[in-house]
Structures are given as C-alpha cells and as structure tokens.
C-alpha cells in the first residue's frame, strides 16, 4: 500500500494533543484533485463537524487549479468525509465530551485516492506548549552532544 502525504497540518500537533486518528475518504471534484497533486492545499484553520450522521470538513483551503477554466471549484467549500457508520458514532460520542474536537491532520494519496487523516484532539494549554518546546530543545542538545562525542 503506497501512501504519499500531500499536505500536513503542522499547527495541529503544536496546538492539540492527538488522542486517536482515523483515515477518511473525501468527496472532491476533478480540479480539486489536480490542485492537490500540485500540493495546493492548506489545513491551517480546518475542522470537522458531524451533522445528521455525516462528517463534513470545513474551512479547508484547496487552491484553484491554475489551468482550470470558469468551472473551477470554490477554494473554501464544505467537503463531505466518507467514514463507516461505527466510526461516525465513535467520533460523535468523543466530540460530545467536553474539550474534544476533530481536526484534519493531513491529506494523502492511498492507492490513487485522496484520503484525509483526522484526529480526535484535546487542546493544549500554553504551559503544555512551553513544556513541549523545552523538552524538544533538551532532546536537540542531547543529540548534538552525542554526535560530538562520537567524533
């Protein structure tokens, strides 16, 4: 199974603690697929909502296809996510808990189809973000010291 990541939401890993991930199909038009092949997507402000038993991706941006004509797609439109019923029920029960939300983490190609990796996330507090930065800096310094010692 070949998986090629197109766009990732790096801000999500900084602002949220990812508890569980799901892979979902997405309903796209032809020009949206062509634009994603050119890496023309952005998941910065995007989120997922569940209404009437269907999952929808909102505020995601897929740039208009540069060779498209007048029938090009809207950049920020509502896009339907394709999930199994039990996955939708699981996500819906998780989101009903206080403080949890569903955030798209990445677009990727799997067997020629565009998929979205979504995560059930809890927001980080500012002190948690600082703690993560301090931890990352310590690991960098440790790796640099190890590298110097092997020379």
Curated annotation (Swiss-Prot):
It is found in: Cytoplasm. Keywords: Cytoplasm, RNA-binding. Its main location: cytoplasm. InterPro entries: SmpB (IPR023620), SsrA-bd_prot (IPR000037), SsrA-bd_prot_CS (IPR020081). GO terms for cellular component: cytosol. The keyword Cytoplasm applies. SUPFAM superfamilies: Small protein B (SmpB). GO terms for biological process: trans-translation. One of its GO terms (molecular function) is RNA binding. CDD domains: SmpB. Required for rescue of stalled ribosomes mediated by trans-translation. Binds to transfer-messenger RNA (tmRNA), required for stable association of tmRNA with ribosomes. tmRNA and SmpB together mimic tRNA shape, replacing the anticodon stem-loop with SmpB. tmRNA is encoded by the ssrA gene; the 2 termini fold to resemble tRNA(Ala) and it encodes a 'tag peptide', a short internal open reading frame. During trans-translation Ala-aminoacylated tmRNA acts like a tRNA, entering the A-site of stalled ribosomes, displacing the stalled mRNA. Belongs to the SmpB family. NCBIfam families: PRK05422.1, smpB. This is SsrA-binding protein. It comes from Chlamydia muridarum (strain MoPn / Nigg).
